Amino acid sequence: MQFAKYFGYLDGVPAQIYMRVLGIDPGSETLGWGIVDGSGLKYAAVDFGVVKSNPRNPFPQRLANIYEGVSAVIDSFQPDVVSIEEAFFAVNVKVALKLGQVRGVLLLLAEQRGLKIAEYAPRLIKQTVVGYGNAEKHQVQEMVKVLLRMKSVPTPHDAADALAMAICHFHHAGVRDRIERSVRKIP
């Protein structure tokens, strides 16, 4: 499926009709990414993969590896938006802190590149993609395959989760934009 990049008007306001979304499943050892092109609820996968970091390397070195890996993805695919999972409360505090640092690096990178940033709760992503907020990982992967008309489930699961985040953005972008515009109008 090919999409042409063009702009139109929504409620008299210039609006981007086509989007290229980079979905990111943050992780300090394996970070999933997925590129999805589309317009409205018509979208297609462009590419997906992972950025792997050696768990034996010092954590700052892993963060640098993540920054460089995602920078390369952004340079290659030129997305308009980065869709990333919101911070969530993990059972292990150490893991939650590391994930927060990874998210910080990713948010900084997106901001430096002038990309729109959309953050979604894990439950909303599952609700959007599967129709059930407590869906299992395999259910999310299967629905990503169906929604993106893929022949097989995208692997590894980190990449499938990243594609799910991009899909989630296509379903919620219009609502987010309308809310942002209405908030800007309030004196």
Describe the function of each predicted region.
Residues M1-P187:
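Phosphate- and other anionic-substrate recognition elements at nucleic-acid/protein interfaces
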